[in-house]
Amino acid sequence: MSDPNLNASHDSVESVEDELDIVEAADAVDPDEAELADAEAGAPAEEAALHVESDEDEDEADVEVDAAVEEAADDAEVAEEEAEEAAPVEPAEPVDPIQALREELRLLPGEWYVIHTYAGYEKRVKANLEQRAVSLNVEEFIYQAEVPEEEIVQIKNGERKNVRQNKLPGYVLVRMDLTNESWGVVRNTPGVTGFVGNAYDPYPLTLDEIVKMLAPEAQEKAAKAAAEEAGLPAPAVKRTIEVLDFEVGDSVTVTDGPFATLQATINEINPDSKKVKGLVEIFGRETPVELSFDQIQKN
């Protein structure tokens, strides 16, 4: 009869020995096989690492290519701009001053009217009207007043000089919207004697008429501006030559009109209107008269 305790002990010993054999077998694995296993295990990881490095290299290469393309584009743009700057600039076509004036006047608000003034008071009327338009709050109706002028050559006592004189003596041009209020402001301006045409419902000038009146000054200004821009002297302009032989205090004979053959003494000369004011003796009394240059002759 066998002892149960001995059998259990024997089984335990065998179990322990089996475990030791397993451990030793594991330790006794061929080194070459281990290295092969390690190599097989590490190959995918190494391949993955190489793939990552390759992607990074490709990204860097793409960035460098993009930078090079952008730099080349910038260089091309700069070169194009420099070429445009270096290219000769074609001179602009000359602008017709009359056509430019016509277009400017056509776009302005209001219409142009002509008012009568006392001779020699044109500039004073212009200044008074501009001041009254502001002080009476009618600037939205009365826009502009103009006294057309021209430059002439005046010869007096042998001395020659250029002077500016009114082109329309006794008249002032006004650009305005005609209302009862604006009409009253203009009509009651000191020095104004009335509107040209219908006194209470005057007719405005046409565009052609106002262009014709203002064109000479516009042409002269355009010619001077073009000469200055080109660095040239102002172009010569044909001037009217006026010989003025009268002086205040001169005794003259009236040659035309109701006072013909009478003697007069000049006390005022107005070159703009080409008129003089003087005293004529009628029935033993001195009477003030206004005479034009062609109505008198120096004694």
UniProtKB/Swiss-Prot annotation:
Keywords from UniProt, A to Z, are:
Repeat, Transcription, Transcription antitermination, Transcription regulation, Transcription termination
Q: Which Pfam families match?
A: KOW (PF00467), NusG (PF02357)
Report the PTM annotation: The N-terminus is blocked.
Sequence ranges of the sequence repeats: 46-49, 70-73, 80-83, 84-87
**Chain spans, region Disordered:** 30-96
Q: Which GO terms describe its cellular component?
A: cytosol
Q: Per the record, which residues fall in region 4 X 4 AA repeats of E-E-A-A?
A: 46-87
Please name the HAMAP family in this protein's record.
NusG (MF_00948)
Q: Tell me the protein family, please.
A: Belongs to the NusG family.
Name of the protein in question: Transcription termination/antitermination protein NusG
Q: Organism, per UniProt?
A: Streptomyces virginiae (Streptomyces cinnamonensis)
Query: Which taxonomic lineage is given here?
Result: Bacteria, Bacillati, Actinomycetota, Actinomycetes, Kitasatosporales
